[in-house]
C-alpha cells in the first residue's frame, strides 16, 4: 500500500539519544575528576605527614600547612596539629565538575583526616576519616 520512509524515524531517535549519551559521558568525567581530586588530596596529606615525621624536631605547623596548600588547589578547610611524636592533618575540599558549573553547585565535598605517629623511630600513618559527600 504505502511505501514508508524510515529515515525520519532514525533521525529522531539519533537526536533523542545524543543528549542522553552526552549526559552519561559528562557524569563519568565528573566522577572520575572527583576521584582524582580525592586521591590528590589524600596523597598530598600522606606525603606531608611522612615528611613531617622524618623531620619531627625541625618542622612547624605552618610549614606543613604551606606544603599542603601549595600542592592542592581550592582547599576549604585545613587544620594541622603537630605534637611531640604525632602529626594530625584534617582537610576539606569542594570539587566542582561540569554539571556543577552548569547549574552552579558543588557536586562533591572531600574530607580527609590523617594521623601520623613515631613509635620507637618507626612511622605509622593512618587514615582516620575519609569522606566523599555527593550533594545533589
Language-model region placement:
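Short, conserved structural patches
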Residues: 55-136
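Alpha-helical assembly-interface signal, strongest on the long, hydrophobic N-terminal helix that forms
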Residues: 1-64
Amino acid at each position: 500500500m504505502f511505501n514508508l520512509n524510515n529515515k525520519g524515524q532514525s533521525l529522531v531517535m539519533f537526536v533523542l539519544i545524543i543528549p542522553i549519551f552526552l549526559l552519561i559521558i559528562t557524569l563519568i568525567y565528573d566522577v572520575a575528576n572527583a576521584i582524582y581530586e580525592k586521591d590528590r588530596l589524600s596523597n598530598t596529606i600522606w606525603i606531608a605527614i611522612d615528611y613531617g615525621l622524618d623531620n619531627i624536631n625541625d618542622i612547624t605547623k605552618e610549614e606543613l600547612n604551606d606544603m599542603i596548600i601549595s600542592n592542592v588547589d581550592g582547599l576549604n578547610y585545613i587544620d594541622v596539629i603537630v605534637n611531640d611524636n604525632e602529626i594530625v592533618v584534617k582537610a576539606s575540599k569542594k570539587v566542582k565538575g561540569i554539571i556543577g558549573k552548569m547549574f552552579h553547585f558543588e557536586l562533591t565535598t572531600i574530607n580527609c583526616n590523617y594521623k601520623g605517629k613515631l613509635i620507637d623511630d618507626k612511622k605509622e600513618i593512618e587514615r582516620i576519616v575519609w569522606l566523599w559527600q555527593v550533594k545533589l
